[in-house]
C-alpha cells in the first residue's frame, strides 16, 4: 500500500529532478577539483577558477591554505571557500615523513576542518598514522605516484600494507600514475574496493608516459570503465581532477575535462 507520505516523497523527488542532467540528478560520480591544478593561482583566483568549472567540490592543496597559518588564519581561509559555496572534501597531497609531520598535519587538518587527508607516507609510519586517524576521526588516503615512486607506485602497493588496518586508512587512486605503473586501473580500483576513499583523475595520450597529459577525454584513459567500476562498488568519495598541465592558464582545459566527464557520468547514471 502506498501511503500519502510515500506519494509526497516520490512527488518531491520527481520535481527535484526536473531539468537536471542525469549526472547531477543521481550524482553517482561526484566530480571535484584537486586544487593543485590551480597551484599558480592565489587563493581568491583559485576559488573563482573552481566555480568557473561548474563544480562545488574541492580538495585543497597547502599552496592555498598554508601549513604555517595560525588556527585563526586557517579558519578564515577555509571560510573563503565556504562563503563561495564550495564544499571542501579534503586536503592534499600531504607528505608524512616523520612523527612530527603526522602531528603537524593532523593538527592542520583539525584547524582547517578537513574531512580527509590525502597523504604520501613512509611505510614504517603507518601504525602511527593509523593511531592518529583513530584519535582524530580524520580518514587518510594514500596517494600512489607511479614508477618514480619507490614506495607506492600503484594503489596495490599500499593496499597490501593497510588491508588489516582501520577502514579509515585507505587509498587515493591516481589513475594516471596507476597506468604508468603498468597496472590495469579498473582492476586496481576493484581490488581495493572500500579502501578507495579518494581519487585523482587525469588523462594521458600514452598511458605509460607522464609528459603526455591532455584534457580528460582527449587521451586513452578508460574513463567510462573507471566510472562504471566506481558505481558498481558504491564508491562514496569524490573524483577530483588533477590537471597538472598548463599551470598558468588551466581553466580552459579543466572546463573541457569536466564537460567530457559529465557526459560520461550521465551515461553511467542511466
Model-derived features: positions:
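Gly/Pro-rich active-site loop or hairpin
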Residues: 47, 151-155, 179-236, 244-252
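N-terminal secretory signal peptides and thylakoid transit peptides that target proteins
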Residues: 1-15
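Conserved, mostly hydrophobic/aromatic
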Residues: 33, 50, 81, 109, ...
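Active-site acidic/histidine proton-transfer and metal-coordination neighborhood
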Residues: 12, 16-23, 44-47, 64, ...
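Catalytic domains of carbohydrate-active enzymes, especially glycoside hydrolases
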Residues: 46-61
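Glycine-rich, proline-tolerant flexible connector loops at the mouths of alpha/beta enzymes
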Residues: 59-76
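C-terminal segment of N-terminal export signals and the immediately downstream linker at the start
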Residues: 21-41, 45-49
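C-terminal helical cap(s) of enzyme catalytic domains, especially alpha/beta-barrels
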Residues: 253-269
Amino acid at each position: 500500500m502506498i501511503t500519502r507520505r510515500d506519494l509526497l516523497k516520490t512527488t518531491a523527488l520527481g520535481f527535484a529532478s526536473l531539468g537536471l542532467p542525469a549526472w547531477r540528478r543521481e550524482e553517482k560520480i561526484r566530480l571535484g577539483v584537486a586544487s593543485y591544478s590551480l597551484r599558480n593561482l592565489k587563493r581568491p583566483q583559485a576559488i573563482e577558477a573552481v566555480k568557473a568549472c561548474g563544480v562545488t567540490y574541492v580538495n585543497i592543496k597547502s599552496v592555498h591554505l598554508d601549513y604555517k597559518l595560525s588556527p585563526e588564519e586557517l579558519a578564515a581561509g577555509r571560510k573563503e571557500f565556504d562563503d563561495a559555496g564550495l564544499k571542501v572534501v579534503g586536503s592534499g597531497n600531504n607528505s608524512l615523513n616523520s612523527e612530527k609531520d603526522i602531528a603537524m598535519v593532523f593538527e592542520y587538518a583539525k584547524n582547517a576542518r578537513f574531512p580527509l587527508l590525502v597523504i604520501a607516507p613512509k611505510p614504517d609510519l603507518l601504525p602511527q598514522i593509523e593511531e592518529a586517524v583513530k584519535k582524530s576521526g580524520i580518514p587518510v588516503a594514500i596517494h600512489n605516484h607511479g614508477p618514480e615512486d619507490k614506495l607506492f607506485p600503484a594503489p596495490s602497493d599500499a593496499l597490501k600494507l593497510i588491508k588489516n588496518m582501520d577502514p579509515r586508512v585507505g587509498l587515493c587512486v591516481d589513475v594516471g600514475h596507476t597506468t604508468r605503473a603498468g597496472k590495469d586501473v579498473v582492476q586496481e580500483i576493484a581490488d581495493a574496493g572500500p579502501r578507495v576513499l579518494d581519487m585523482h583523475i587525469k588523462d594521458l595520450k600514452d598511458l605509460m608516459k607522464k609528459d603526455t597529459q591532455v584534457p580528460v577525454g582527449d587521451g586513452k584513459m578508460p574513463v567510462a570503465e573507471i566510472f562504471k567500476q566506481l558505481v558498481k562498488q558504491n564508491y562514496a568519495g569524490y573524483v577530483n581532477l588533477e590537471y597538472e598541465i598548463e599551470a598558468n592558464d588551466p581553466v580552459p582545459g579543466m572546463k573541457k575535462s569536466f564537460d567530457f566527464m559529465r557526459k560520461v557520468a550521465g551515461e553511467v547514471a542511466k
